[in-house]
């Protein structure tokens, strides 16, 4: 496995796809990096030379990835909750943030159902 920016990427995959294993680099970012490094995106990771790996590292060094990106996202969410914005309140309550409905659905964000028992009707 080749190491790029401290992350092991799979050898058997095309370099274009293998770069997406790095948190913060998607397919479009991977294509941009490979274009900067002047490397064929169809090339397999195992076929890359050391010079090509160095070129990829240099091209990708400007991107915020892995720990730095996760930290920035967490700080952004923390800031939203501290200032009491709508999005911050939704984050705090573990509800959908982007305006989705919650009466039905939203199970991923809310977690498993909490069943509420019905009151028994007393007969006279």
From Swiss-Prot:
The keyword Nuclease does not apply. It holds the Pfam family Ribosomal_S13. This is Small ribosomal subunit protein uS13. Coiled coil: none annotated. Belongs to the universal ribosomal protein uS13 family. The keyword RNA-binding applies. Located at the top of the head of the 30S subunit, it contacts several helices of the 16S rRNA. In the 70S ribosome it contacts the 23S rRNA (bridge B1a) and protein L5 of the 50S subunit (bridge B1b), connecting the 2 subunits; these bridges are implicated in subunit movement. Contacts the tRNAs in the A and P-sites. Part of the 30S ribosomal subunit. Forms a loose heterodimer with protein S19. Forms two bridges to the 50S subunit in the 70S ribosome. Residues 93-124 are annotated as: Disordered. One of its GO terms (cellular component) is cytosol. Keywords: Ribonucleoprotein, Ribosomal protein, RNA-binding, rRNA-binding, tRNA-binding.
